[in-house]
Amino acid sequence: MTTNAPAGSSAAAGSSRRLQQTQNQVDEVVDIMRVNVDKVLERDQKLSELDDRADALQAGASQFETSAAKLKRKYWWKNCKMWAIGITVVVIIIIIIVVWSISS
């Protein structure tokens, strides 16, 4: 029995050592997973902020498009008015020339 006691003791020590190694590995994996979860949460927050910025940019682009269309329409009408004024002036000048040439 004396010979079995040290063998049992060394087997228990080896088992304890393996258990400790396994526990250390588990602790290491748990730490890595905590870091990964933190990174995922940070990524989620950044994606959420990016999504908010994209929504704001889309709203700004839509507003810009509307304003640009209104401005285009405004200047198109201004251009039409200028053409109408120019044509009217030319017609009046032609009428004056014709009336002046007939009356002379």
Swiss-Prot record:
It is found in: Early endosome membrane; Recycling endosome membrane; Synapse, Synaptosome. There is a cross-link at K70, K72, K81 (Glycyl lysine isopeptide (Lys-Gly) (interchain with G-Cter in ubiquitin)). One of its GO terms (molecular function) is syntaxin-1 binding. Residues 103-104 are vesicular. GO terms for cellular component: cytosol; early endosome membrane; neuron projection; plasma membrane; recycling endosome membrane; SNARE complex; synapse. Gene3D superfamilies: 1.20.5.110. GO terms for biological process: positive regulation of receptor recycling; protein transport; retrograde transport, endosome to Golgi; SNARE complex assembly; substrate adhesion-dependent cell spreading; vesicle fusion; vesicle-mediated transport. Residues 7-16 have a biased composition (Low complexity). Residues 18-78 form the v-SNARE coiled-coil homology domain. Ubiquitinated by RNF167 at Lys-70, Lys-72 and Lys-81, regulating the recycling endosome pathway. Residues 1-23 are annotated as: Disordered. SNARE involved in vesicular transport from the late endosomes to the trans-Golgi network. Interacts with POPDC1 (via the C-terminus cytoplasmic tail). Interacts with BCAP31; involved in VAMP3 export from the endoplasmic reticulum. Interacts with BAIAP3; this interaction is increased in the presence of calcium. Interacts with PICALM. This is Vesicle-associated membrane protein 3. It comes from Bos taurus (Bovine).
